[in-house]
């Protein structure tokens, strides 16, 4: 099975920490040069150094994925400094407080949708405009297990990820005959550094119990799937929503 990304250029939004960082490092280990963006400059600097230590080129840009000009600048920089865009992982996203719909605010809605949905759309658009002239490219969107299953109180987050899933499938069909593959990863609860810091061990155990496998996922388990979807090993896959959730959505 061919999992090499040798000399490819991978672009990762939200690549400074968590799942984005894990995926960026996995792409680098597979041989890709990697461009990352994030809103936090310090995490960019650290992750960029880790990527370069793996013997590949790295670019880091501060970027607000909800802003079209900022996203354009990021992709333009990646293209100019690394020579193109072969792989895009639209990973940047935010959660929202658990709130029933009647109690939500317009500000909550705008924040979640502008980053999770608009940010993914902008990343896809910039990618396609660079990939289509070359007749090849792979786009991976970070959806969620909640793009397949309802979860009371998570309305805006769930809605944004359902929309990402729908946009993934629809756009995959639009460009399937032009050398572009577009898929999404749908993670369950993953033991990211942020989750470890912000959620008590008791709550972590409760989250683990909700999965049939009775544990939380590891960031590398998501990163491995990203490498698979970016590689020729998944060459006949497009429009797929890949569940990596310990069986949660199978319940």
What residues fall within each predicted segment?
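Alpha-helical segment proximal to the catalytic Tyr-Lys
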Residues: 129, 173-174, 235
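Substrate-binding pocket helix/loop in short-chain dehydrogenase/reductase
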Residues: 99-101, 105-110, 195, 207
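A conserved structural motif in NAD(P)-dependent oxidoreductases
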Residues: 211-222, 233
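Active-site helix of classical SDR
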Residues: 124, 160, 168
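Short C-terminal tail/terminal secondary-structure segment
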Residues: 95-98, 149, 210, 227, ...
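Residue(s) in the substrate-gating loop at a strand-loop-helix junction
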Residues: 144
